[in-house]
């Protein structure tokens, strides 16, 4: 499987954004971690803390998986493994944390995927899902990078495994909504430029960190 577009390469430089969402997820990341659809592994360094004992990178695109060692710290390499495939390949194993960072929106049958992942979750474990918000923002960019849809809270809750008990469900990057609206109705770009990514990451994410607390 080959990943469409250059989304991963563009957003690899969005370090403020990665620090922001990682700060929300990291308190739940512990023990044996499975990173589903890890891409090039660029999120792992932001998510790993002292409570992580092992880290499994799972990616269906072999070319992307080959780049993982280039993007992770030496300490993480010592406790990590790379697996080419999908969650079906890990049947019978258990993990304390399962991550889906910008992955579920690419999958036609999201609920089935999360059900399979949940079967790999150890008792007391956490399933962490990050997806793009609001279907009304769906644009040429989403289509270009293979997004099936965007989510609101109710849709996300409905696709979680029926046995799961949601601990937290919220929106991030309120200022990003304005930029997405501008692209959808004015720019009509299939992908942002590097300078646009930098503007969003350096100028808008710090504002979102403040605004997200009050909205």
Name every feature range the model reports, one short phrase each.
Residues 157-172:
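A SAM-dependent methyltransferase catalytic signature shared across enzymes that methylate proteins
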Residues 8, 127-159:
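Short, glycine-/aromatic-enriched active-site segment of Class I SAM-dependent methyltransferases
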Residues 101-104, 130:
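Residues lining the SAM
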Residues 111-126:
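A short glycine-rich, Lys/Arg-flanked "PGG" loop and its adjoining helix->strand segment in the class I
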Residues 7, 42-43, 168-208:
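Conserved catalytic loop of SAM-dependent methyltransferase domains
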């Amino acid at each position: 499987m080959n990943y469409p577009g250059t989304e991963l390469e563009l957003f690899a430089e969005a370090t403020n954004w990665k620090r922001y969402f990682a700060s929300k997820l990291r308190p739940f990341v512990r023990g044996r971690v499975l990173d589903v659809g890890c891409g090039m592994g660029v999120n792992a360094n932001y998510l790993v803390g002292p409570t992580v004992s092992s880290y499994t990178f799972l990616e269906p695109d072999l070319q992307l998986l080959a780049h993982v060692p280039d993007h992770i710290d030496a300490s993480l390499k010592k406790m990590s493994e790379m697996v080419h495939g999908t969650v079906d390949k890990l049947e019978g194993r258990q993990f304390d944390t399962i991550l889906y960072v910008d992955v579920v929106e690419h999958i036609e049958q999201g609920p089935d995927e999360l059900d399979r992942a949940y079967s790999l979750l150890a008792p007391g474990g956490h399933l962490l899902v990050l997806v793009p918000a609001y279907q009304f923002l769906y644009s040429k960019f989403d289509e270009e990078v293979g997004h099936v849809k965007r989510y609101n809270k109710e849709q996300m809750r409905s696709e979680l495994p029926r046995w799961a008990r949601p601990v937290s469900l919220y929106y991030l990057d309120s200022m990003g909504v304005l930029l997405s609206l501008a692209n959808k109705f004015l720019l009509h770009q299939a992908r942002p430029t590097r300078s646009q990514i930098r503007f969003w990451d350096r100028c808008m994410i710090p504002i979102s960190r403040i605004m997200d607390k009050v909205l």
